[in-house]
Design a protein with these regions (language model features):
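Extended accessory regions or peripheral subdomains of proteins
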Residues: 1-11, 16-57, 93-180
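Short, charge-rich binding segments
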Residues: 28-29, 75-82, 121
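FAD-binding glycine-rich core of flavoenzymes that anchor FAD
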Residues: 60-81
Length: 180
């Protein structure tokens, strides 16, 4: 299923666990994200469909992320996993500089970055495949912004496309030596 739907950049697989030892009820595939946030130092970049929408020097990147996230409202649904999409990614080790004032200036000095990864990288996850390992059910989820024209129709179209891909008998195979 992952290879059929998520064989692309900006995807992920989350497995739930109970007590750190038992297989959990849900497995969640995050499908290719169109939108992401990258933070390097105190510069926040907002990227949509691979194009930078803006870059801002900010005093507090965590506050910027919190404001960005506040625009998303998703209802709580009974008997569904608590995770329903939103921001997925990582906060790197040096994120502490945004929290601890004593480290702000000490870490602000430019340090070598041999691997070139952002301090924070978050994908906006709109489309999900949710496996309920208890019931054996698979669900396709998508988010639609009611403020966006034709959002509902676009969401239905995305879900129908995902269903067709799932029903197809073929999937992309990983090519040895190419990393894909």
């Amino acid at each position: 299923t992952y290879l059929k739907l998520a064989d692309a950049p900006w995807t992920f697989l989350l497995e739930s666990v109970q007590g750190g030892e038992k297989w959990g009820r849900y497995s969640i595939i995050g499908l290719p994200s169109r939108e992401r946030i990258e933070v390097r130092g105190f510069t926040v970049r907002h990227i949509v469909d691979g194009e930078q929408q803006g870059a801002s020097e900010v005093e507090d990147p965590l506050a910027w992320i919190e404001r960005f996230q506040s625009r998303f409202k998703v209802p709580d649904l009974d008997d569904q996993p608590r995770f329903d999409g939103g921001l997925v990614g990582y906060f790197g080790y040096d994120t502490i500089r945004y929290i601890e004032p004593k480290l702000r200036t000490a870490l602000a000095a430019e340090k070598p970055d041999p691997i070139g990864v952002p301090d924070i990288l978050l994908m906006v996850c709109d489309d999900l495949v949710v496996f309920d390992n208890l019931s054996g059910r698979l669900q396709l989820w998508t988010h639609a912004d009611p403020e966006t024209p034709h959002a509902y129709d676009n969401a239905v179209e995305r879900l129908e496309t995902l269903e067709l891909k799932l029903r197809s008998a073929t999937f992309n195979t990983l090519s040895p030596g190419t990393g894909r």
